[in-house]
Amino acid sequence: MKTRMFATLCLLIGGLFLSAAPVSGQVEFLEQNWPADVRQEFYTTSQGSRIMPYSWFIALEISDSQKSFYRDRLPELGYLPNSLSTNNPDKLPVGFVRDQNEFTKAEYIGMNCAACHTNQISLSGKTFQVDGAPALSDMWGMLTGLDDSLKATRDNADKFDRFAAKVLGAEANNTAAKKKLKSELTNFLKYWSKFIQDSTVEHPWGRARIDAFGMIFNRVASIDLGIPENSKKPDAPVSVPFLWGTSFQSQVQWNGVAPNTNDIERLGRNVGEVLGVFAEAEFQATSIFEIPKFARTSAKRFNQVRLENLLKKLWSPKWPEQLVAIDTAKKAAGEALYQTHCVSCHAIVPHGEQNTPVDVKMTKLSEVRTDPKMAANATIGVASTGDLKLLFQGRSKVPRGELLQTLVQLAVISPYRDVAPPESILDRLTRDDLFGTNEINLFLREIGFSKQTVQALHADLDEKLKSYYEDLQSTVKSFVGQPESATVAENAPPTLKYKAAPLAGIWATAPYLHNGSVPSLYELLLPGNERTSKFYVGSREFDAKKVGFKTEQAPGTTLFDTSLPGNSNAGHDTYGTFNEEQRWQLVEYLKSL
């Protein structure tokens, strides 16, 4: 049944260095098969993220100055400018987007995938922008910076007056309007500061890393589900993965927990991502004995499908050989070494258009011997199911990964947050008399498809849509079936694994390993005990010899200490004992992928 549902939905939705400071001067875009209009669509399309009211974000000052938070502070934190867009009047950074509640018309600031998956590098005096590459930004610095600025705005009368003047405009002198704004700000801070407090870890993530699983889990399983005790410190940050080729990989996430073989699975991955960056979701019920009346989300699933389809066309970046040539003799020798020692895990994908699925290799932690914290955090431990107990056969506690996966699946099929349906989609889907065109249309509208898109889909896919809807009904009926007794093996040791994916474009994605603990490809080929134990992250100056970014301290960089929990740079060093010459040969070949 699930296979048919997935298949049907697939048919449905078919000189070597730069400073850590913001890049100035002309930026060149590497050839990755995206024309300028497609690139701007990726940079500016909302996926339903809603951090705070849009007018607040535009008006917000840095906590200790009168400078603009988004114009002045975000570039300091590594977020890239987007001044070329015609669909971005306020010149928001790449991946920061305006979202609108289609029912109330309220506007919000949000983020899309481009904010964390676009980077710039400098090589031989030129600056290149790489789409789909891991950003060198400081997301935790951004979140805490917002907290500091909001608190300063609430507490400093002059700062609040300037804030109110920008937000309220002509109403800024209206005492009642200012009082209402102050109350709204205070109430927002109760939620926001609690979120920051619960998410604060002893050792901040630093540049180029995010604990994506931890943030998504806390947002969905603690805040949205309304169970504070489910919250767990997001203390296993990982390197931001690159996006080219992702659509064709059988599994995604560093620990491979997200299946990715069809468009509904890809949509689930993207819905989980936007829930982690502040999409709204409602999972709570009025009673622990019933399914929530409205399980709704602001995730704009149609837009997410659009963005995913753009990523399918994104090519990996080619090494800029016109600036630094690849040594062909070393490359040939390195290719032979790669075929002997590496290709069994890291398949080779030709540069250019990709249409062929790739079965990624999942490697046991006992074999690769890299830091276990991310895999352990995502796998070990249980969480409360709360109002959704019936979705888990009556179990009050389930493994953390299972809870998150189910909540994301529920969000995928939930009504669109800004639509006010007459009854819950979950109620309707458990009835047997609702396979008409109108009902299917309503479902498609509720998950974010436009009227025009729904009409076009029905013109060609009427029977397939009905089949998908029937499959979906069967799935939901299984969700709301009778509770069954079940136990949780809390102490059962899971088999921890990490993903080994193709390495196309790997040269543009430092630092390396899943936790970003190795600064260059050259060091990745060293034994673990010979790698750098402390280095700085955030510089965009590129070392074309070792293939990585400059690691000296500079303004805006953050220290990476491999002795801290979750930061080990050990492992991935048992696949061949290379001498120095062989290391450089492999580096030269890796540049060419």
What are these regions (language model features)?
Residues 17-26:
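Bacterial Sec-dependent signal peptides at the C-terminal "C-region" and cleavage site
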Residues 8-17:
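Bacterial N-terminal signal peptides
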Residues 25-593:
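Periplasmic c-type cytochrome electron-transfer domains
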Residues 1-4:
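Positively charged n-region of N-terminal signal peptides that target proteins for export
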Residues 6-9, 61:
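N-terminal helix-rich structural modules
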